[in-house]
Amino acid sequence: MATPVDPPNGIRNQGKHYFSMWQTLFEIDTKYVPIKPIGRGAYGVVCSSVNRESNERVAIKKIHNVFENRIDALRTLRELKLLRHLRHENVVALKDVMMANHKRSFKDVYLVYELMDTDLHQIIKSSQVLSNDHCQYFLFQLLRGLKYIHSANILHRDLKPGNLLVNANCDLKICDFGLARTSNTKGQFMTEYVVTRWYRAPELLLCCDNYGTSIDVWSVGCIFAELLGRKPVFPGTECLNQIKLIINILGSQREEDLEFIDNPKAKRYIESLPYSPGISFSRLYPGANVLAIDLLQKMLVLDPSKRISVTEALQHPYMAPLYDPSANPPAQVPIDLDVDEDEDLGAEMIRELMWKEMIHYHPEAATINNNEVSEF
């Protein structure tokens, strides 16, 4: 539970109160009443809370020492920029970014999201029975959210069960946009690509220069297979083993299906693998719906140019009972959203831009802290 504590050094900042959860200090706006910690990651701790002004339940993520690691700081900035613009019922909503007290010295960032009950990873590994209706509805919502994200020219690049939040009535929302990129920037953002290997598309494993929205479709296929089988379909131990597992199930590929590989060394490796006849998905998932298997086969295709698109997947007969094209308008997002250019930023500019994001949620602070806020 959340334990009230005195502020550090006995100095209480205006509009803040202080709590300890899992040995972590939370300095949060007084309108939020923390309940209990609900998650922990490399970034810090997440707690559930209530906004006493709106009576809404929210999740507060504290990112500790955000500037300690430049890559983590960039991920946080990217999340802030994107979620301020993305508005869709299958994308987690960022409700607030708490205003830091001092622009030049703040170290921690507090993000306030809508509260969800669990994530798809927890559901898959639980004993909860997953019917065809469950699998169909989860997949539909994932594809629907992804269609919206792609319509904003954004690649998520880190789709996995743990990044899909779920609540008790099976509503699903995509979260964690720290690795997202715009899809009109090609072949220049591999530097910190650390997406979970098991869900990584072949074109990324094979170090191809050009890739697009189909990388997210591959990840969706891996997640769908995991829903059907209750375990990862390609649980590789390292990169080469990951490729080997993929070929083992998909089968050895024809020459024309390897033309997308523009890395000669990677192509030679694929061609050197022993012949595999492949394993049919209907054999791997004998209890699955026939249409589900057909859609899965179209998602998990090695050549990205032959992989089904998100829109085509939503129009597939397996999704037909749920999909209404008129209910899926494209995202209204600025086309110059510059999340890719951030990689060259220095620490002070990252700090400046984070402060700017806070100001979007607290415009009154721009005048109150007039002496600290530069013109944007």
From Swiss-Prot:
InterPro entries for the chain: Kinase-like_dom_sf, MAP_kinase, MAP_kinase_CS, Prot_kinase_dom, Protein_kinase_ATP_BS, Ser/Thr_kinase_AS
SUPFAM superfamilies hit by this protein: Protein kinase-like (PK-like)
Ranges where the Protein kinase domain occurs: 32-319
Changes after translation: Dually phosphorylated on Thr-191 and Tyr-193, which activates the enzyme. Phosphorylated on Ser residue.
Enzyme class label: transferase
Modes of activity regulation: Activated by threonine and tyrosine phosphorylation.
Record SMART domains: S_TKc (SM00220)
EC code: 2.7.11.24
Coiled-coil segments: none
Record's keyword annotation contains Transmembrane: no
Residues at the active site: 158
Residue numbers of Phosphothreonine PTMs: 191, 196
Gene Ontology biological process: protein phosphorylation; response to wounding
Residues where ATP binds: 38-46, 61
Positions of post-translational Phosphotyrosine modification: 193
Quaternary data: Interacts with MKK3.
Protein family membership: Belongs to the protein kinase superfamily. CMGC Ser/Thr protein kinase family. MAP kinase subfamily.
Free-text note on domains in this protein's UniProt record: The TXY motif contains the threonine and tyrosine residues whose phosphorylation activates the MAP kinases.
Name of the featured protein: Mitogen-activated protein kinase 2
Organism listed in the record: Arabidopsis thaliana (Mouse-ear cress)
Lineage: Eukaryota, Viridiplantae, Streptophyta, Embryophyta, Tracheophyta
Gene name of the encoded protein: MPK2
